[in-house]
Amino acid sequence: PLEINWEYLLRAYIVIKEANMNERYTELVNAAIAAKEFSYSPYSLFRVGAAILSEDGQIFKGCNIENVSYGATNCAERTAIFKGVSEGVKSIKAIAITSDEEDFTYPCGICRQVICEFGTEVDIILVNNKGETRMSSIEELLPSSFSKETLLD
């Protein structure tokens, strides 16, 4: 059975309110925290949850899904993005990412490139295991990116 860490959710909620995040971003963070609970990570035990906010206001959740062959593993960020894209999402406004770590968990290089594919001005909300948040952007995490605009110019 799924066990939700309510204390963790409450701490994240309080930190977000104190940071004056808008209500949709609060929902996004809560969705990422909930998604982490479904992580399939029997090899690394490194659970990650993510949630995207599409430009039209929809939220899609994803968790990391490991595979014994490692290369077939899918990160939480890409799971959430691919879920949204498979439902018609063409651009992303924001993504929230959380793990069980005390430090903030940043998206890997592949995930940064995939995020950039669906938005060059994406807000990135990182949440640690204390419920503290850090705001970033895809421009900050992937400067001078190779994007679809590069090919279309």
Give the residues covered by each predicted segment.
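C-terminal binding/interaction regions
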Residues: 24, 28-31, 35, 92-153
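Short loop/turn motifs at secondary-structure junctions and domain boundaries
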Residues: 41-44
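Short beta-strand scaffold segments in enzyme catalytic cores
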Residues: 47-53
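Compact, glycine-rich, soluble single-domain proteins
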Residues: 64-78
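Short, solvent-exposed cationic patches
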Residues: 75-96
